[in-house]
């Protein structure tokens, strides 16, 4: 197989580096910092060792989304995108970029996405969950992207014809009481998936994809649990005497199988992959590692040996991403 394409692969700039400190033991923090700040050295060597031809890079989480001050959020997003563009320009055959976006201000986010796609050559955006804005309850209310204020932004995403990767972040403290006393459930063990799955379901139910059917949303971690629940979600909404009303015109499974793509980032289990293929089809699944929070060798060695057909391995490992992100043009 030609080299794999991996697309949930993170980096940091000094201003956002400490956002990742809480997700690893203190003894590992020095190594994680080095991994996040490195692009051209260890990362590239590991890519070569494990037949990863291209990485699409994105800013660590929550970064821009957790900056309530509008001007600072815009500044950090632009700074991170400029740094990433410089790094990608050194090895355009190996690295591509996802835009970081200041969605505290939908118009500013649309403008920055436009700049990143048309001037910097980025292939889409990766946004770390909901945003916080000082103008909305001082930043204490999460802003989810099904809200009406984001419709013009989504129209621009569709017009630019680039995918949007919805990446996790933890819920705000006031929304995380169920985790009190159980910090092991926060972050990638559970809270990330729950938070992101609900956000994605809100997008589906809002009617967004009826208005903008060309949108393509990417979810990591084998779909954040949604594929296993699609039948039940639609079944219960249809079965009850008075179905819960939502604006969307179709079933959740219709939007998920037509407007969503899923990656294997940070979830290296063959049984889960096979279930995902049965629910979504091999044309909408893509390989990823979640470096540097997961190890490249773990992801690549698992995927290269997974019990799937070679045709599916090629699609998942390379051609789906190459097509979606127009990398072979």
UniProtKB/Swiss-Prot annotation:
Location of the active site:
290
Q: GO CC: one term?
A: cytosol
Which cofactor does the UniProt annotation name?
A: Zn(2+)
Reaction catalyzed = 2,6-dihydroxybenzoate + H(+) = resorcinol + CO2
Q: Which pathway does the record list?
A: Aromatic compound metabolism
Q: What class of enzyme is it?
A: lyase
Its EC number(s):
4.1.1.103
Spell out the InterPro entries in the cross-references.
ACMSD (IPR032465), Amidohydro-rel (IPR006680), Metal_Hydrolase (IPR032466)
**Induction field:** Induced in the presence of gamma-resorcylate.
Q: Which Pfam families match?
A: Amidohydro_2 (PF04909)
Recite the UniProt cofactor note for this protein. Answer: Binds 1 Zn(2+) ion per subunit.
Q: What happens when the gene is disrupted?
A: The mutant is unable to grow on gamma-resorcylate as a sole energy and carbon source.
Keywords from the UniProt entry:
Decarboxylase, Lyase, Metal-binding, Zinc
Q: Keyword check for S-adenosyl-L-methionine, yes or no.
A: no
Q: Where does Zn(2+) bind?
A: 8, 10, 167, 290
Instruction: Name the GO terms of the biological process aspect.
Output: secondary metabolic process
Give the transmembrane ranges: none
A single GO molecular-function term is:
metal ion binding
PANTHER family assigned to the protein according to its UniProt record, in alphabetical order: 2-AMINO-3-CARBOXYLMUCONATE-6-SEMIALDEHYDE DECARBOXYLASE, AMIDOHYDROLASE-RELATED DOMAIN-CONTAINING PROTEIN-RELATED
Family statement drawn from the similarity comment of this UniProt entry = Belongs to the metallo-dependent hydrolases superfamily. ACMSD family.
The role this protein plays is: Involved in the gamma-resorcylate (2,6-dihydroxybenzoate) catabolism. Catalyzes the reversible decarboxylation of gamma-resorcylate to resorcinol.
Please give the name of this protein.
Gamma-resorcylate decarboxylase
**What organism does the UniProt record list as the source?**
Rhodococcus jostii (strain RHA1)
- As recorded in Swiss-Prot or TrEMBL, the protein's gene is named tsdA
